[in-house]
Amino acid sequence: MTIIIIVLSYFLGSIPTGFLFGKFLKNIDLRLIGSGSTGATNVLRNVGKWPAFFVFIIDVGKGLLAVKLSQSYTNQHLFEVLAGISAVSGHIWPIWLKGKGGKAVATGLGMFIALSWKVGFASLGIFLIILSKSKIVSLSSILAAFFLPLFMFLDIGVTNHPYFLISLVVSILVILKHRTNIRRLIKGEESKINSLNK
């Protein structure tokens, strides 16, 4: 049963929310425009504010539901982590889109809200604070990911717990998925979210 839940979590994460919104609302393939990501930020820029909001909420739900599904079966922390990272992996490398998905920010957030709501909302707080000051989504995501392992350590107090280890893995993964954004940030060329009037 554990293997089934882990596999189901991957397929849950693989649901291409942003891609579907782009196709149905604007008949566009988000993989071919903007950042090429199917995440909420690319939806915001190319489809609209409200579609991006719903994509974000659904993508958060994918990570949260995967962990909650595992918790309904067992309370083993390692199993919860495996289900969560399976959903995150599905979001980044969805089978339906030949492995080209999002950057794991929203789905990772949902995963950590389910594992530790304090850590999840602390990371969300960092994201929102940086976004309000900088108007740069990528910078906000990178810094939220950077502080994630610290928040988890402060919450559980150890570094050999599956929760801390997965926070480290997801932090690195999210930052690596933003490599091109980091290069643009260094050059001062990263786009800002200045208008949300779509």
UniProtKB/Swiss-Prot annotation:
One protein family per Pfam = G3P_acyltransf
Q: Could you tell me the superkingdom of the organism this chain comes from? A: Bacteria
Which keywords does this Swiss-Prot/TrEMBL entry list? Cell inner membrane, Cell membrane, Lipid biosynthesis, Lipid metabolism, Membrane, Phospholipid biosynthesis, Phospholipid metabolism, Transferase, Transmembrane, Transmembrane helix
Q: Supply the InterPro entries for this chain.
A: G3P_acylTferase_PlsY (IPR003811)
Task: Note the SMART domains from the entry.
Answer: G3P_acyltransf (SM01207)
Q: Name one GO biological process term.
A: phospholipid biosynthetic process
GO MF terms listed in the record are: acyl-phosphate glycerol-3-phosphate acyltransferase activity
Q: What class of enzyme is it?
A: transferase
Q: Which residues form a coiled coil?
A: none
Cite the annotated pathway: Lipid metabolism; phospholipid metabolism
Please tell me where this protein is predominantly located: membrane
Q: List GO terms (cellular component aspect).
A: plasma membrane
Q: What topology does the record note for this protein and the membrane?
A: Multi-pass membrane protein
Q: What is its EC number?
A: 2.3.1.275
- Swiss-Prot/TrEMBL catalytic activity: an acyl phosphate + sn-glycerol 3-phosphate = a 1-acyl-sn-glycero-3-phosphate + phosphate
Q: Where in the cell is it found?
A: Cell inner membrane
| Annotated TM spans | 1-21, 77-97, 111-131, 136-156, 157-177
**Assembly with partners or alone:** Probably interacts with PlsX.
- Report the protein's function: Catalyzes the transfer of an acyl group from acyl-phosphate (acyl-PO(4)) to glycerol-3-phosphate (G3P) to form lysophosphatidic acid (LPA). This enzyme utilizes acyl-phosphate as fatty acyl donor, but not acyl-CoA or acyl-ACP.
The record's family statement is:
Belongs to the PlsY family.
Q: Which NCBIfam families match?
A: glycerol-3-phosphate 1-O-acyltransferase PlsY
- Entries under HAMAP family matching the protein: PlsY
Any idea what this protein is called?
Glycerol-3-phosphate acyltransferase
Organism field: Prochlorococcus marinus (strain MIT 9515)
Q: In the record, what lineage is assigned to the organism producing the protein?
A: Bacteria, Bacillati, Cyanobacteriota, Cyanophyceae, Synechococcales
